[in-house]
Amino acid sequence: MTGIHPVDITSEVKTNFINYAMNVIVDRALPDVRDGLKPVQRRIMYAMLLEGLYSNQKHAKSASVVGEVMKKYHPHGDSSIYDAMVRLAQWWNMRYPMVHPQGNFGSIDGDPPAAMRYTEARMTKVAEELIADLEKETVDLKPNYDETTEEPSVLPAAVPNLLINGATGIAVGMATNIPPHNLTEICNGLLAMIDDPNLTLDGLMEHVTGPDFPTGGRITKTGIREAYATGHSGLKVRGKARIEEKNGRNQIIISEIPYQVNKTNLIQTISAMYKAGKIPDISALRDESDRKDPVRIVVELKRGAIPTLVLNQLYKYTQLQTTYTVINLSIVGGEPRVLPLLNTMQYFLDHRADVVTRRTRYDLRKAEERAHVLEGLLKALDHIDEVISLIRGSNTGAEARDALMVRFGLTEIQSQAILDMRLQRLVGLEREKLQAEFDELQKTIEYLRSILGDEKLLWREIKKEIRAIRDNYGDERRSTITELEEDIGKEDLIAVEDMVITMTKAGYLKRTKLDAYRAQGRGGRGSSGGKLREEDVNTRVFVGSTHDYLLFFTDQGRVFHEKIYDLPEAGRDAKGTHIRNLLPSLREDENIASVLSVGGFDEPGCFIFATRKGVVKKTLITEYGNITSAGLIAINLQPGDELIGVGIVNDIDHVVLATRNGKAMRFESDEVRATGRATQGVIGIRLREGEDDAVVSMALVPGGDEASELLAVSECGLGKRTPVGDYPAKGRGGMGVITLDVTEKTGKLVTLARVAGNEELMVLTEKGTVIRTRVEEVRVTGRNAQGVKVINIAERDSVISAFPIRREDEL
């Protein structure tokens, strides 16, 4: 027989990989739910215990600790052991460090530690609580890797290390990411669980409010309960920053950064975002961190910069805001499990109950053994002369021991203790001391037996120890729990600025900073305002804030909206973007009838609509807050009707409707009852049957100001200005009064608009001619007049559109 056995490679690989995976999961990467330590961390603590590196002793070379661990317990290379030891010492990684470092143990900037031959270490005071009572047989020992010695399978862990320091690890096919917590809160939660075995998660969260990171920061409350209920969730963590003013400029001081964020990387990201134009208002960036302020990053801002806006940009584009993914995975009974918070804490309490029980049994055994010895010593002292005589008469120690056992009924242990007793113990004072010790031991034995016999006393002992841990090591929270913070949206990253919005007859739209218009100053020659085709012209020019909504109402009764900051920004000479590229849901036969800007949909007031057939409708602005990219029905139109204008009114405003045949109807807006969004409206002006008439304009008169003027322009280029007071305010639904004496000379009415007198009048003709004149040059005449020649029209040409726009020097 050769000794070579053929095996199936598939099953062999599967078996070996499973064994490897479980070895990594259980023996390397994941912490035990009881002491919160991975095997390498536990071995480091045990080695430091054996070397006597307590918190009150001298530091020892890190290399000696690493060597001891690698030699006896962890044969996986010195670098992994030293890396684990270094992490246990780093304040920015451990909420309660377990190793007290001396020398260079790295930095929050990601600097590596010095070599282990240069650094020294010892345990911290709180680390001693992990190994307390280890010598009292409180945990099971197991053989080390080569079976030359033993190591603990778990530490007694008087502190809830898994929760106060958290854990991070990547195994095969799984990972753990447990956040650190505040020791005081965890201890209070444990005490509450002992007092109320049926404590709910909400009751527990009255004590444990959330994670507490060593680097501080702000944790959003949303997600914490889910993490505690399921063991898995995401937490939004922000660094802490404040805004200060220095030398007339604002600066942002970052004093705390999110957990596990590298400070140098954060600074580099801020610099990169500035260069990329994401955070343009930074003028200087400095790292002023020192021993007093471990984290102090100064972000100086340019003059005029809005600090809250820059801070939002820092949260959005840098690691100043991160998401911490909670995966509460640990080893339970030799298997990996994701646990809710209550279960994690209960496993710790069960572990402490087991440790305290085993310690009590050990202490009881030792107390009973000592009491047994003292009982023999006291009996010997009561018969000291006889004992001395008996011992002197014996030839050997064994003979003396046997004689004592026979004469006084002692055990072998008691007899040997008498023989080992020094002569000075024979004095009377020593007997009193022995008696006092014996009496005290009897009380101790009684107390220890009561703990083992009464579960309530056991838990009372555990509570006493938890309180002592809390009182000795508890501290204030470093991280702040905040209520829900809105996600940083696009609007939070854009400054509030005034913009000039222009739209041309051909449908090109753009926004330009108002400063670009004002920079020229009054009295200049002006500029084109855009590189337009000869037949194109700006038909709408108005000022709005970047955070305002721009509403586009179509002639088919639909409405679209865009934030002004979403419009293409361009210089004064640029053409802009076509409206159909901005609103792809526009139908081919659908055109923009009106454009309005609003600050939001919670504003007071109503939209008022006018149609070609004389219908008006009024609807609250709040009805339009759910406009989608596909548009929304703004008004239901009758067949053959179309929307010609939309405005914003309050109840004291007046409305003037004008028709092609020169009729105008003025009425108060409160005569139109506000109705729902998808309604048809009511008659505003009645058109005479049989006549080719239609509404061409709607003018709004704020507060019914009769001193303001209405500008009328006809097809043949005649125009006039007429005071609003010349138009009687009649109830809606009538046929109106004459606003223009329409004749063959004037042609039909093209537009009627309210003007202030400082606008420019833009006139477009059928053959593409664009004429621009000042409104103030149009004569003021009566309502029944035909007006005067505003522009000269070529033969066989006519005006198709006329509208006042704000002059550039009035923006």
Swiss-Prot record:
EC numbers, comma separated: 5.6.2.2
UniProt-listed HAMAP family: GyrA
Official protein name in the record: DNA gyrase subunit A
Keyword hit for DNA-binding: yes
Disulfide pattern: none
Name of the gene encoding the protein in the UniProt record: gyrA
Group of enzyme by EC: isomerase
Protein keywords: ATP-binding, Cytoplasm, DNA-binding, Isomerase, Nucleotide-binding, Topoisomerase
Summary of subunit composition and partner proteins: Heterotetramer, composed of two GyrA and two GyrB chains. In the heterotetramer, GyrA contains the active site tyrosine that forms a transient covalent intermediate with DNA, while GyrB binds cofactors and catalyzes ATP hydrolysis.
Principal location class: cytoplasm
Organism (species): Deinococcus deserti (strain DSM 17065 / CIP 109153 / LMG 22923 / VCD115)
The organism's place on the tree of life at top rank: Bacteria
Entry-linked InterPro entries: GyrA, GyrA/parC_rep, Gyrase/topoIV_suA_C, Topo_IIA-like_dom_sf, Topo_IIA_A/C_ab, Topo_IIA_A_a_sf, Topo_IIA_dom_A, Type_II_DNA_Topoisomerases
